[in-house]
Structure formats: C-alpha cells, structure tokens
C-alpha cells in the first residue's frame, strides 16, 4: 500500500547551501520533517551544480513524516541574468533595455530547462525563453 501524502512543500533553495534557517526550517518544521536530513540530502544532490544557484524543489511529505523531493532546473530568469551579466531585469522592459543575449545562449538555456518545460521542439522552448528575456528588458540578438 502506498504511503499517505500529508503535504507538498515548494521552495527555492540555493544549490549546495540548504540549512535549517528560513525558508527551509519553518516550512519543513511545520510538517514535522527532519530538517537536517533534508538539508544533507539536498546538498548532496546539488553539489555538482554551481553553488548558490537557486534550485526549485518540490518536497512530498508523507503521513509518517518521511519525505521525498524532486529538484527542478534553475528559473529561466536567473539563467538569463547570468548569461547577460546583469544584476536584475529592467523595471520598464518596453522602454529600458538592460542587456543582450544571443540566440546561442537562448538555445543553451532552453536545452538546460528542456525537462521542466512544455513544448514539442527546442525551437518552441527557445521562443518561450526569448519571451522571458524580452519581458526582463533583455535584447535577443540573432
């Protein structure tokens, strides 16, 4: 018989830097999960990734207080900011452009995020990433 799911907890945690302080501690402590056990498992799973990169994670908490978790790819906005070399997107993306990304960079980001995105082909995923870039005030160059 399958375990009974008590809750799903969605967080963004820096790769390799999970610790019991907020946001991890309160979110998991509320569900009665062993926080240090999660932190060790998460840090072990994300040690190959760039340290500090925000990683979305979905934690499934079961009635017996055990848990499983699934890590996703970093948000497109974070990857675009890194590729363009900017701190943050534009406050007025239709008027102020803050940086540039090439189509090759967009393709690379789309390939990185392919598992977490909908869309049949890499081209449709690239269009989605390019749209995110434009809404952040980045210019997509051919």
UniProtKB/Swiss-Prot annotation:
Any single GO CC term annotated in Swiss-Prot or TrEMBL for this entry: cytosolic large ribosomal subunit
Keywords: Methylation, Ribonucleoprotein, Ribosomal protein, RNA-binding, rRNA-binding
A single MF term (Gene Ontology): structural constituent of ribosome
UniProt xrefs under Pfam families: Ribosomal_L11, Ribosomal_L11_N
Keyword Nucleotide-binding carried by entry: no
Coiled-coil residues: none
GO biological process: translation
Cross-referenced PROSITE patterns: RIBOSOMAL_L11 (PS00359)
Post-translational events: One or more lysine residues are methylated.
Xref: InterPro entries: Ribosomal_uL11, Ribosomal_uL11_bac-typ, Ribosomal_uL11_C, Ribosomal_uL11_C_sf, Ribosomal_uL11_N, Ribosomal_uL11_N_sf
Family: Belongs to the universal ribosomal protein uL11 family.
PANTHER family: 60S RIBOSOMAL PROTEIN L12, LARGE RIBOSOMAL SUBUNIT PROTEIN UL11M
Oligomeric and partner information: Part of the ribosomal stalk of the 50S ribosomal subunit. Interacts with L10 and the large rRNA to form the base of the stalk. L10 forms an elongated spine to which L12 dimers bind in a sequential fashion forming a multimeric L10(L12)X complex.
Function: Forms part of the ribosomal stalk which helps the ribosome interact with GTP-bound translation factors.
Protein name in UniProt: Large ribosomal subunit protein uL11
Native species: Mannheimia succiniciproducens (strain KCTC 0769BP / MBEL55E)
Lineage: Bacteria, Pseudomonadati, Pseudomonadota, Gammaproteobacteria, Pasteurellales
């Amino acid at each position: 018989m399958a375990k009974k799911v008590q809750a799903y907890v969605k967080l963004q945690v820096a790769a390799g830097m999970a610790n019991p302080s907020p946001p991890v501690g309160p979110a998991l402590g509320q569900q009665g999960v062993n926080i240090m056990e999660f932190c060790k498992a998460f840090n072990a799973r994300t040690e190959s990734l760039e340290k500090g990169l925000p990683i979305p994670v979905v934690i499934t908490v079961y009635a017996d207080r055990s848990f499983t978790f699934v890590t996703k790819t970093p948000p497109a906005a974070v990857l675009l900011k890194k590729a363009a070399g900017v701190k943050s997107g534009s406050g007025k993306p239709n008027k102020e452009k803050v940086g540039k990304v090439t189509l090759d960079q967009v393709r690379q980001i789309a390939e990185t995020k392919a598992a977490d995105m909908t869309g049949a082909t890499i081209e449709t995923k690239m269009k989605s990433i390019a749209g995110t870039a434009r809404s952040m005030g980045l210019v997509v160059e051919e």
